[in-house]
Amino acid sequence: MAVKQVEPIDVVLVGGGIMSATLGAIIHRLEPTWRIRVYERLGNAAQESSNPWNNAGTGHSALCELNYTPELADGRVDISKAVTVNEQFQVSRQFWAHLVETGALPEPSNFINPTPHISFVWGADNVEYMRKRYEALKDHPLFAGIEYSDDPAQIRKWAPALIPGRRKDQPIAATYSAAGSDVDFGSLTRQLLDGLEIDGVEFEASHQVSRISRSKISEGWVLDVRNEIGRSKSRIAAKFVFVGAGGGALHLLQKSGIPEIRGYGGFPVSGEFLRTDDPEVVQKHAAKVYGKASVGAPPMSVPHLDTRIVDGKASLMFGPYAGFSPKFLKQGSVLDLVMSIRPHNLRPMLAVAFSNFDLVRYLVGQLLASKSTKFDALRDFMPTAEPGNWHRITAGQRVQVIKPDKDKGGVLQFGTEVITSADGSIAGLLGASPGASTAVPIMLAMLQRCFPERWAQWEPTVREMVPTYGTDLGDDPALADRTLEHTAKVLGLHH
């Protein structure tokens, strides 16, 4: 099969989700003359993890997610991870605000809406933890305005659905931030890609990249591509490749042969949510409320009751309920897990299997749980919830990163991991939450690693897009306040 064109494409983005769309939007502004092409296996963009019903749509800024503020052995609450996540989200907010201001994105309410973020717990020990967490966060510039209460009357004002039907003697506590958001990453992805297409970026739907290999005739890569309509095959050359194919990224990076992927594996976790579109139920709750994971449960198990705004219509979602599927993509193959096993990642995968009994126990418990048991988890948040008003939906597949470790053999990593080749000509993204919310800083950091020789000339443009890039807002309260106020105004959020 011959290479289709003599001149290689400057940039090929594999996968039509939020990561590729974000990277394409950034590169196009840094190098407007570069030829960029996006390949998407399915018939349209944002059909897997970026689809609004395949994720909870939380603009992850650690305002309410308790897994980012663990309690240490000495009783103190560590907020360092929360600060990092919030700093990253502010970079994304600045980039989105820049695109809105320059007309590259239309009305922001099409993809982001103000939604209060609430942490909610019950039980005396959890109430004490919540109080300590609030004390640790309240004076930080990025968490200014956060409120705390253990008064049911006040909590009812913040989130009316949490209180009716609850035992009056149950200790409860909550924190509230009006600065939260709900993000439709599917809409954002499509709008970014639509804008890129208008500017000449090529988007090829229904095209699957089946193999990536080093070019033997020039620097860069050769990609084998199959048109899913008609099944025709082609081979194209690219100078730089980004594999943003979600759960499919591991397979393609393995096929590329880069040594940096050696030892890495993936652990797929499926998920379900309960959803209601009933207007009477939806109007009782307008917030994202995150609880506390059970003792020993993994971070992915944190339960939350979410307002979702998709296509201008409000709904509620509760979950996640975890399950197991060997697929790496929702529309993937049951052989995905088996086909990802290599001699170099077998030891890390076995090490993770033997050292994560809490995760195994959690997954088995979720798989064996009855419908009534699962619904009781929703009633912990909304005591008056009725099964007839809710239906189950299947979320996107999450592939947790199994990372090689010298001491333990392998560790299970929650979050995202960027893999880049030594020469910076190929990169890929593995992992899950809070990926979409932090897409902009992740992609900027990746570009800095892959194109170090260009970064100095790119930096002025980066500063136009993200004025505080490289600065910790937490170290400058005045700058943090100005930045949050500006992006909130542009994006229609609360400050």
Model-predicted segments: where are they?
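Short hydrophobic core segments
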Residues: V12-V14, Y39, R235-G248, M443
